[in-house]
A protein has these predicted regions:
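Basic, amphipathic alpha-helical segments enriched in Lys/Arg and hydrophobic/aromatic residues
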Residues: 381-439
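Intrinsically disordered or highly flexible coil/loop and linker segments, enriched in small
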Residues: 36, 40-43, 60, 213, ...
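Conserved, well-structured functional cores that handle cations and Mg-NTP chemistry
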Residues: 2-219, 223-250, 257, 264-281, ...
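Short amphipathic alpha-helical "interface-anchor" segments enriched in bulky aromatics
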Residues: 118-120, 224, 272-278, 355-388
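An anionic, glycine-rich sequence signature occurring as long contiguous blocks
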Residues: 156-185, 189-193, 246, 251-369
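Catalytic-loop motifs flanking and including active-site residues across diverse enzymes
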Residues: 147, 369, 373, 396-402
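Buried hydrophobic packing segments
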Residues: 151, 203-204, 377, 403-407
């Protein structure tokens, strides 16, 4: 088993020999939670072995080295595992719905934060599902890769991965030249082109419908925050978004007047309201930030980092968002400025008017756990080591990686509890997030 070292978290615990010896029994008990969701005995067995393989200390965690480590030189076992992952008809979504209940039991909090982000996976060739030469975040440049969209969870008690979607570039869905590849990869016929923000929405909506995980916030970067339709859908669920937005995002300082223009008596009557003639133009969020007085900015600690507190300057004010050129909802504009470089980050949030700045500062530091999940998954759990090419195989692999990651979160939770002197109550897990102010 690996010695799991989370990034930018509270100090981790070394696994003692007794702990290591007990992990296989603990893993078996953990897998038993999900076993009833696999209809066939072979699926139950191979799913347990796959999760076990992801936890092994191996240089690469694709199917063959994992099976050889667990089963020895058994080529039939390798083929059986490949079939289980690439073609097996088992329900990822049912497994993840059960997983959300487990996350709530261990980490759930009324102030929980859902986090949306993408993670890319460099790949060779053109046959893997959804692969395309596109911007690859892992490499920081355009490259041949697959793009995933992920939903995570963070609370004062820890963090976890929740769900995953594979992004299919539009040509993969609509271009006849890709028809053979779609069939070879097993892409379902009813899959339509979906943007990354709407893939994120599909995961949020599914989680909300399940009603199994306590949460209040949704945090995302500007790749998602620029999509006002996504933000309005989140608002419609009664959740509070905290979304980074591009610097050219526009807003009004005060709600401008609108009216239906008078009808001239000829042609069609004006169908909708418009800004009145003397209405001010909306400003960019950068223009709004530059006009703030110096005393509008306060220095705040975002979170405790591995090298000490992370500090930035913050300002906020109410603004009116733009929707199709007209005034939309009144929201918070939150501005975060790097103390050393002056780099500006801009956010919009539909949190209530009464929300204190300290809570918005807290949420601004809650996106990092999902990035940490990606680092941990790729470094320790083979998140990017898969060699399957199919639609089903990609989602199966990611689902089992999500389970493997949360198993380690649970182990650290138990070890942290047992390390407290005299059984004293303490933080519930070694992979902690800061506590929100006022809670």
């Amino acid at each position: 088993m690996i010695d799991f070292q989370p990034v930018e978290t509270a100090p981790t615990l070394e696994l003692a020999p007794d702990d290591i010896a007990a992990l296989l029994d603990e893993l078996e008990a953990y897998h038993a939670i999900y076993s009833p969701l696999f209809q066939r005995r072979e699926q139950r067995e191979w799913s347990a072995k796959y999760v076990h393989g992801l936890l092994l200390e191996l240089p690469r965690k694709s199917i063959e080295p994992m099976v050889l480590a667990l089963e020895g030189a058994n080529r039939n076992a390798v083929r059986a595992m490949q079939q289980f992952l690439s073609e097996g008809a088992w329900d990822d979504d049912a497994i993840l719905r059960r997983h959300w209940q487990e996350v709530d039991a261990d980490l759930g909090d009324a102030d929980g934060v859902l986090t949306l982000d993408g993670s890319d996976f460099p790949k060779q060739g053109t046959e893997s599902v959804g692969v395309k030469r596109q911007y690859c975040g892992e490499l920081g440049k355009r490259a041949n890769c697959q793009a995933g969209v992920f939903l995570g969870y963070a609370s004062p008690h820890g963090y976890a991965l929740l769900d995953r979607r594979l992004y299919l570039p539009e040509e993969w869905v609509t271009d006849d030249a890709y028809a053979e590849r779609r069939q070879a990869c097993g892409i379902p016929d009813d899959i339509a082109f979906t943007t990354k923000p709407m893939l994120g929405w599909a995961m949020i909506e599914a989680l909300h419908q399940a009603s199994s995980l306590r949460c209040r916030w949704v945090a995302c970067d500007e790749g998602f925050g620029r999509d006002s339709a996504l933000l309005d859908k989140i608002d419609g669920l009664g959740l509070w978004y905290f979304a980074e937005v591009p610097h050219d995002t526009r807003a009004w300082l005060e709600r401008p007047a609108i009216a239906i223009p008078p009808w001239s008596g000829r042609g069609r009557k004006p169908p909708r309201e418009q800004l009145v003639l003397d209405a001010p133009e909306p400003q960019t969020v950068v223009q709004i930030a530059s006009a703030l007085p110096s005393d509008a900015w306060t220095r705040q600690v975002i979170k405790e980092g591995s090298n000490g507190p992370i500090v930035a300057e913050f300002a906020q004010r109410r603004v009116v968002a733009v929707r199709e050129g007209l005034p939309g909802p009144e929201v918070w504009l939150v501005l975060r400025r790097n103390v050393e470089t002056g780099e500006l980050k801009t956010y919009l949030s539909n949190a209530p008017v009464r929300t204190h700045q300290s809570r918005l500062v807290w949420v601004s530091g809650m996106r990092w756990p999902l990035e940490t999940c990606f680092e941990e998954g790729k470094q320790y759990l083979g998140l990017g080591d898969y060699e399957v090419r199919s639609w089903r195989g990609w989602h199966h692999h990611m689902t089992l990686c999500i389970l493997a990651h949360f198993f380690l979160v649970r182990v650290q939770c138990r070890l942290k509890k047992s390390s407290e002197p005299d059984g004293a109550a303490g933080p519930r897990t070694a992979v902690q997030c800061p506590t929100p102010p006022g809670v």
